[in-house]
C-alpha cells in the first residue's frame, strides 16, 4: 500500500450546540445538533438550527422515494415544527437492531453478516429516477475536506474515472440501521444519506463504518462476503476507499477517527 506525503493534521470541525429536549423524553439517539426520541408509537427526529429547512425536507423526500421502491423501510408520517425545531416523524418499528443481535450472539457473526450483505444487495437491486447521484455528493465532500490541495485534486480526478452507477445506495448502511422484527422480518432505517450510485462505493463506506466503530475483524469478513455476493474483487472496492474516506472526513469526527480517515484518504494505490 503506497501513501502520498502525510496530510496535515487537522482537528475536526467545532461541534454545534446540542438540541435541548424535555427530561421526560425517551431519547434513542443523540448526535451533534439533532436528537431522536420515541414519541408514543412513532419516532421523532429533532433537528437543530444548523440544519437547513431544504435539507430536512429533502431527507424526508428521499426516505419517501426509498419506500416507493418497495423496500421495507420506516415510513415518514409527517414533517413538522415543534418549539422552533423542525422535525421528521416516522413510524416506530418494534424489534432489535442487527447490531444488538450480533453483540448478543457473537458465535453466529458470519450468519448475521451474510444476512446483512443480502439485505444490502436487495437495496442495490432498486433504483429511482428522482434521486441525486452519490458521485456528486462525494465530489462536494472531498472539496470540503481538510486534505492538502494536491490530494484533493487527485481524488477528484479519481472520482471522475469511477462509474457513477444507478443503484440505490443507502449511504449509512451499518448494523445499527437494520431492525429485525419479532417475526424475523427486516426493516432498514435512517435513509438521510441515500443516493444513486455504484454499489461498490456504498460497500466501501460500510467497510469504513465497521473500522471506525472498532470492529476491524468484522470489517474484513464483511468485505469478503460483499465482494463474493457482488462477484467483484476486493481490489475493486478498495479503489473507492480513498474517495469515501476523504468524503467522510469532511464531517465531524472524533480526533482519532478523523486522523484514521485522513490516512485512508491519502492512499494512492493498493498492491
Residue ranges and their predicted role:
Residues 26, 30-56, 64:
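ATP-binding glycine-rich loop module of kinase domains
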Residues 35-38, 157-201:
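Active-site acidic catalytic loop and adjacent metal/ATP-binding pocket
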Residues 61-72:
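Structural motif at the C-terminus of the N-lobe alphaC helix and the adjacent alphaC-beta4 loop
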Residues 75-86:
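Short beta-strand micro-motifs within the conserved protein kinase catalytic domain, predominantly
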Residues 84-97:
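Conserved short submotifs of the Hanks-type protein kinase catalytic core
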Residues 125-171, 181-182, 266-268:
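An alpha-helical support segment within catalytic cores of ATP-dependent transferases
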Residues 205-271:
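Helix-rich C-terminal or lid/interface subdomains of diverse kinases
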